Amino acid sequence: MAGASALLLTATTPAAANPNAINPIPVLNGTAGLPHLLGRTRAVFQVTGMASPNSTQNYNVLGTDLGIMWDNGNGEMLTAFGDTAGVGFPNLLAGSLWSWRSNILVRSHNQDPDNGIFFDSVVHDIFGQARDLVASPKIPLIEISRIPTAGISVNGVQYMSLMSVKTWDDVGQWTTNYSGLAASGDDGESWADLGFTHRPNEGGNANFQMNAFTKSGGWVYEYGTRSGRNNPAYISRVREEDIANLGEYEYWDGGKWKKGDVDAAAPIAENVGELSVMWNDYLGQYVMLTTDPFNSVVMRKASSPEGPWSDPEVLIDTRELPTAYAPSIFPYQTGRDLYFLTTVHNQYNVVLMRTSL
């Protein structure tokens, strides 16, 4: 197995971390049409970009990544995308020829993704362009980007967890300043950066720089990893009404929950990238999607939010789609079919995937 793993690593090129060295123009970037996958997963819809039925170029989104989806509490789906490229004044300081935004939001009422995900509206500026939700100076070594990693609705308020990126490092690696919450009371139109929720990239808080949310029994469960990919995953929880109060968070130490002690958190899974977690009615289990060290998209299952989590199952083999990252689960139940978004870095856009459970 060790020899096979080494061969696999040398045969593929994983997704880069730096989003500035990209080309989102179809054909010119070497891509045309949806990825052709032969395994258990199929690419079913181009969600963003010039080749998408959503025509996101109409609001100056030529390329983007992530696609973190959640229900706003009223049957509307909100989707936050990360670093976003368009035409306009280039962000040369960050090494990009594109006009850059770090976090944008679209809305949809699509609860059946079988024919795709279609957007109803976008948070935009006076020119109709998708705009940053939370401002970022985009200055290397200070804050080069502020990227959403999780979203959730609690008591009519929308919350996003964002990471403040200091530097882009080696392939699949970056360094953050901190993570923290932003909140919106108007369906994602305007956002307040909640500075008192910032987790500095040090000590136990370093394990919660990138997040995923799920809710159960009045609790919000927050999954966390260090900045970058191929790190252990951790979990905390907090009562819904206390989501913005870091002192009320409890951390799973491998056997019990410990309140207020972030250093007590023990790993619940190893070698993960960006995370997405959701209860699945068909399986009667929680499902976790992420990428593995070979850059395959993988799934784990568990009967409770803290686990124990199963060994990973490959949903998209890296040999079929080596630049895929950040799988994000569609937030509504869809029976035996599991739908999720995945970024394809070499086209720098987001694709809807479907796999049979």
Q: Which positions does each model-derived feature cover?
A:
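Beta-rich carbohydrate-recognition and catalytic domains
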Residues: 20-62, 71-144, 153-203, 219-270, ...
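Short, surface-exposed charged micro-motifs
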Residues: 68, 150, 276, 288, ...
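Short amphipathic beta-strand and strand-loop transition segments with alternating hydrophobic
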Residues: 149-151, 211-212
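Flexible gly/pro/ser-rich segments immediately N-terminal to CXXCH heme-c attachment motifs
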Residues: 201-215
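Beta-rich, blade/repeat-based domains predominating
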Residues: 209-212, 273-280, 323-331
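C-terminal structured domain segments
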Residues: 315-338
